Amino acid sequence: MAVKKFNPITPARRQMTMPTFEEITSQEPEKSLLVALKSKAGRNAQGKITVRHRGGGVKRKYRIIDFKRNKDEIPAKVATIEYDPNRSAYIALAIYSDGEKRYILAPAGLKVGDVIESGVNADIKPGNALPLKNIPVGTVIHNIELQRGKGGQLVRAAGGSAQLMAKEGDYATLRLPSGEMRYVRIECRATIGTLSNATNDIVNIGKAGRKRHMGWRPTVRGSVMNPNDHPHGGGEGKSPVGRPSPVTPWGKPALGYKTRKTKKYSDKFIIKDRRAK
């Protein structure tokens, strides 16, 4: 996929880049797979802000994605490749031979007219979903389950892929995009291939307005807030932090502070930390 550049007719256009969307084949989504998506503006059910800097943005509809890929031994033909405003990867509309329609995450190289399948007997080709025990070692995969039948949870972003490194006993060893090596139960499913829209990470937004359309609001520095809003706030004019080190809005150390639980149940499945050299 290519990235489009613009002539510098304005300061924003000078840096802005945008996907060419050349893989997209349909502008209209499948209505039966759409549901209303209410804007939460970063609030939880109590109305408290749980994600800062969210709000506004263009109204979207949620596309129901088949992360489970559990319709076995029934071939499906790819009807369209579509843009999904709720994720970075593209999605594909698959129409099964019995008439059912489902959206799946579109791997790179998947084209309209291709036939995909799920199940233990599916071929090893992009878009097919199989249990890890039926996938050869060394295969590149995405949309990986952590619990059997729960649906893919790992490696779902644009351009993402993991590699199946080994299979031993009840577990498969995976190398994730972060560099982490971890065990996953061998009966969990994964989809073959690398996800589409690999150049998403080099797209330059270019101007604040584009971010506002995406539902992101400005990030304000703590030092320009009042002391009741942030530990760095207050003082006359430009003031120092006033503490031994910078802290978060909730008073936790902002630099070098581990935020992951020190005793998490899943630690035993991680062979190599993503930060390890």
Curated annotation (Swiss-Prot):
Single GO MF annotation: transferase activity
PROSITE patterns assigned: RIBOSOMAL_L2 (PS00467)
Keywords: Ribonucleoprotein, Ribosomal protein, RNA-binding, rRNA-binding
InterPro entries assigned: NA-bd_OB-fold, Rib_uL2_dom2, Ribosomal_uL2, Ribosomal_uL2_bac/org-type, Ribosomal_uL2_C, Ribosomal_uL2_CS, Ribosomal_uL2_dom3, Ribosomal_uL2_RNA-bd_dom
Highest taxon in the source lineage: Bacteria
Disordered: annotated span: 222-259
Entry GO CC: large ribosomal subunit
UniProt entry tagged with the keyword rRNA-binding: yes
SMART domains: Ribosomal_L2 (SM01383), Ribosomal_L2_C (SM01382)
A GO biological-process term: cytoplasmic translation
Keyword presence, Translocase: no
Cross-referenced HAMAP family: Ribosomal_uL2_B (MF_01320_B)
Known partners and oligomeric status: Part of the 50S ribosomal subunit. Forms a bridge to the 30S subunit in the 70S ribosome.
Family note: Belongs to the universal ribosomal protein uL2 family.
Physiological role: One of the primary rRNA binding proteins. Required for association of the 30S and 50S subunits to form the 70S ribosome, for tRNA binding and peptide bond formation. It has been suggested to have peptidyltransferase activity; this is somewhat controversial. Makes several contacts with the 16S rRNA in the 70S ribosome.
Protein name per UniProt: Large ribosomal subunit protein uL2
Organism whose genome encodes this protein: Clostridium beijerinckii (strain ATCC 51743 / NCIMB 8052)
